[in-house]
Structures are given as structure tokens and as C-alpha cells.
Amino acid sequence: MNYDFLIVGQGITGSIVALQLKKNSKKFKLIEGGSPNTSSKVAAGIVHPISLKRCNLSWRGREFYEFSDSFYKEINFESDTELYKPYKLIRIFASFEEQNNWIGKTNNEIYKHILSLNSKKIDSLKNRFGSGIVEICSRLSVNEFLDFVSSSFLKSKVLIKDVFKAHELKLKNNRFHYKGDIYSNIIMCDGVNALKNPMFNYLPIIPNKGELLKVFSTFLPTKIINCGIF
């Protein structure tokens, strides 16, 4: 069978690429090995246009946020589930310098609808320098989103649950041949697994190691709180 694309990896990137190809009526297959430990599966899913460390608007940040906002709202509609919803992000200032920088930005025409000062006390938090609010912020329930995409593409027989084997990929007449099918293009969305791929193992990728602490409490705030970490 002939296809326009083969997508390797069904994390956040692979899922979005697949949905965009579907929207543009492209013929494709999506392959996912099902590893339990991937960066997508532990991602916080927080979306906003600000680089918090420097309190700067990211490059084309407003444009990218608006695109993401529209895209994920469509996913809410298609899934009939609120996988994506708006939040306020509270930034705890680490110094008077950061506080002054934030105050200055709130008076700037570019930032005045994005950043504001938080005048309310946050219970149980050390907050001696005060805090600010990122008004334009949302959060995606990443694992639920990935499950929705997986379920949808399994039903349409687009998704293949298998480990991609790079040594079985052959290039003939400017077409990629893989397990009996022919693809015009391949998009690799397999993250750190690129280190195992002879086509990309020269890239200076350094795997990250991290730990998660899950807390279940009826007293947790409904806002996102950031002070270097979330």
C-alpha cells in the first residue's frame, strides 16, 4: 500500500502531526511502540506565551498560543471532553528584582493583557516578594489527549502498535519501504529513541532523568503555581 507519510512516535508531537495530516486529507500511518516512560506521558501540558525566567514574551509566543488554543479547543469538540481548559498561572517572585521587572512589564502595551500583579495572599506559601499572574494560560490533560488520539486512529486502522525497527526501513526509488508498505515521507517523532536510530544517532541528544511526586489533596489550589518548578 502507498502512503504519503509514516509517522514514528505517538507522543504529543506525533499526535498533533497526525491530526494535521488527517485534516489536510493526507494518507498516512502512525506507529507507536507503547513505552510507559516517555517525556509526553509526564509532560505538565501547560501552554502560555511567556518565558518565565526572564519574564519575556517568547518568540512569536502570542501567535503560537492562539494557534494552540484554537487547535486544542477543536480537540475538546471532537472528543466531547474537556481535555484542554484555561487556568491562571501564579508566578511566585524569587526577588525584588523579579518583582520590579514584572511590574514594569505590566505597564508595557505588549504585556498589559498578558501579565498582571496578584494582590491576593496565597495561603500556606512563603511569598515574601509577592507574585504575578499570567492571564493567558491553559492546560492540556496530556495522557487523556494521547489516549483519545490513540483510540481514534486505532478505530480507523491508521495506528500501528509496534516498535519501529530502523533496520527494516529501505530506500528505493526515492520512496521509503517499511514492512510491505511504501511511503513518500517519514516524520520521526520518537524523542530520545533517535539515539537508537542509525539515521539520527549522531545528534547530541542527552537523555534527561527526572522524578515525579503525585499529591492527592482536597486542599490543592485550582490555579497553576510556579516558582522555578510547577
Q: Where do the PLM segments sit?
A:
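Dinucleotide-binding Rossmann-like beta1-alpha1 core, especially the glycine-rich loop
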Residues: 45-128
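Extreme N-terminal leader/targeting segments of oxidoreductases
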Residues: 1-4, 23, 143
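Flavin-dependent oxidoreductases
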Residues: 16, 172, 176-230
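Conserved Rossmann-like nucleotide-cofactor binding loop
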Residues: 13, 36, 193
